[in-house]
Amino acid sequence: MTDAKVFDELWQVICERAASESLEKSYVRHLLFHEKGIDKSLEKVGEEAVEFILAAKNGVSEKTVGEAADLIFHMMVALKAADVDFDLVEEELAVRRAGMHLHD
Protein backbone atom coordinates (compact mmCIF):
# COMPACT_ATOMS: atom_id res chain seq x y z
CA MET A 1 0.00 0.00 0.00
CA THR A 2 1.22 3.50 -0.80
CA ASP A 3 1.61 6.12 1.88
CA ALA A 4 -1.32 8.56 2.00
CA LYS A 5 1.11 11.46 1.64
CA VAL A 6 0.88 10.94 -2.13
CA PHE A 7 -2.23 13.12 -2.00
CA ASP A 8 -0.35 15.85 -0.17
CA GLU A 9 2.47 15.67 -2.71
CA LEU A 10 0.02 15.80 -5.62
CA TRP A 11 -1.76 18.77 -4.06
CA GLN A 12 1.59 20.54 -3.66
CA VAL A 13 2.40 19.99 -7.34
CA ILE A 14 -1.02 21.32 -8.37
CA CYS A 15 -0.51 24.43 -6.21
CA GLU A 16 3.02 24.99 -7.53
CA ARG A 17 1.90 24.68 -11.14
CA ALA A 18 -1.02 27.01 -10.51
CA ALA A 19 1.33 29.64 -9.08
CA SER A 20 4.09 29.32 -11.68
CA GLU A 21 3.81 31.46 -14.78
CA SER A 22 6.82 29.72 -16.32
CA LEU A 23 4.93 26.48 -16.89
CA GLU A 24 2.80 27.67 -19.80
CA LYS A 25 2.47 24.14 -21.18
CA SER A 26 1.39 22.71 -17.83
CA TYR A 27 -1.80 20.65 -18.06
CA VAL A 28 -2.80 21.91 -14.61
CA ARG A 29 -2.44 25.52 -15.75
CA HIS A 30 -4.36 24.71 -18.94
CA LEU A 31 -7.29 23.53 -16.83
CA LEU A 32 -7.09 26.29 -14.23
CA PHE A 33 -6.67 29.21 -16.62
CA HIS A 34 -8.86 28.03 -19.48
CA GLU A 35 -11.19 30.59 -21.06
CA LYS A 36 -14.14 28.55 -19.73
CA GLY A 37 -12.92 29.16 -16.19
CA ILE A 38 -13.84 26.58 -13.57
CA ASP A 39 -16.23 24.96 -16.04
CA LYS A 40 -13.26 23.38 -17.83
CA SER A 41 -12.07 21.64 -14.67
CA LEU A 42 -15.60 20.56 -13.82
CA GLU A 43 -16.16 19.17 -17.31
CA LYS A 44 -13.06 17.01 -16.84
CA VAL A 45 -14.35 15.78 -13.47
CA GLY A 46 -17.62 14.79 -15.12
CA GLU A 47 -15.85 13.08 -18.01
CA GLU A 48 -13.54 11.15 -15.71
CA ALA A 49 -16.42 10.20 -13.39
CA VAL A 50 -18.31 8.65 -16.31
CA GLU A 51 -15.19 6.80 -17.47
CA PHE A 52 -14.64 5.49 -13.93
CA ILE A 53 -18.25 4.33 -13.63
CA LEU A 54 -18.09 2.50 -16.95
CA ALA A 55 -14.78 0.83 -16.12
CA ALA A 56 -16.06 -0.31 -12.71
CA LYS A 57 -19.36 -1.51 -14.16
CA ASN A 58 -17.56 -3.50 -16.84
CA GLY A 59 -15.32 -5.14 -14.24
CA VAL A 60 -12.00 -4.18 -15.79
CA SER A 61 -9.87 -3.65 -12.69
CA GLU A 62 -6.79 -2.14 -14.38
CA LYS A 63 -8.98 0.35 -16.25
CA THR A 64 -10.95 1.09 -13.08
CA VAL A 65 -7.76 1.90 -11.16
CA GLY A 66 -6.53 4.22 -13.91
CA GLU A 67 -9.86 5.99 -14.18
CA ALA A 68 -10.06 6.35 -10.39
CA ALA A 69 -6.63 8.01 -10.42
CA ASP A 70 -7.74 10.33 -13.24
CA LEU A 71 -10.91 11.22 -11.35
CA ILE A 72 -9.08 11.98 -8.11
CA PHE A 73 -6.51 14.11 -9.94
CA HIS A 74 -9.17 16.12 -11.78
CA MET A 75 -11.20 16.55 -8.60
CA MET A 76 -8.13 17.99 -6.92
CA VAL A 77 -7.58 20.42 -9.81
CA ALA A 78 -11.26 21.43 -9.58
CA LEU A 79 -10.83 22.04 -5.85
CA LYS A 80 -7.92 24.35 -6.65
CA ALA A 81 -10.05 26.11 -9.27
CA ALA A 82 -12.77 26.57 -6.63
CA ASP A 83 -10.16 27.90 -4.17
CA VAL A 84 -10.82 25.05 -1.73
CA ASP A 85 -7.76 23.67 0.04
CA PHE A 86 -7.40 19.90 -0.13
CA ASP A 87 -6.55 19.90 3.59
CA LEU A 88 -10.22 20.72 4.23
CA VAL A 89 -11.27 17.59 2.37
CA GLU A 90 -8.80 15.50 4.37
CA GLU A 91 -10.10 17.06 7.60
CA GLU A 92 -13.70 16.32 6.61
CA LEU A 93 -12.83 12.71 5.87
CA ALA A 94 -11.08 12.44 9.26
CA VAL A 95 -14.15 13.86 11.03
CA ARG A 96 -16.40 11.43 9.21
CA ARG A 97 -14.08 8.54 10.01
CA ALA A 98 -14.03 9.50 13.69
CA GLY A 99 -17.83 9.67 13.65
CA MET A 100 -18.00 6.15 12.26
CA HIS A 101 -16.14 4.86 15.32
CA LEU A 102 -18.80 6.37 17.57
CA HIS A 103 -21.43 4.12 16.03
CA ASP A 104 -19.42 0.88 16.05
Swiss-Prot record:
One of its GO terms (biological process) is L-histidine biosynthetic process. Its EC number is 3.6.1.31. HAMAP family: HisE. Pfam families: PRA-PH. The keyword Cytoplasm applies. NCBIfam families: histidine_hisI. Keywords: Amino-acid biosynthesis, ATP-binding, Cytoplasm, Histidine biosynthesis, Hydrolase, Nucleotide-binding. The lineage of its organism: Archaea, Methanobacteriati, Methanobacteriota, Stenosarchaea group, Methanomicrobia. Its main location: cytoplasm. It catalyses: 1-(5-phospho-beta-D-ribosyl)-ATP + H2O = 1-(5-phospho-beta-D-ribosyl)-5'-AMP + diphosphate + H(+). Belongs to the PRA-PH family. This is Phosphoribosyl-ATP pyrophosphatase. It is found in: Cytoplasm. It is an enzyme of class 3 (hydrolase). One of its GO terms (cellular component) is cytoplasm. Pathway: Amino-acid biosynthesis; L-histidine biosynthesis; L-histidine from 5-phospho-alpha-D-ribose 1-diphosphate: step 2/9. InterPro entries: HisE, PRib-ATP_PPHydrolase-like. The keyword Plastid does not apply. GO terms for molecular function: ATP binding; phosphoribosyl-ATP diphosphatase activity.
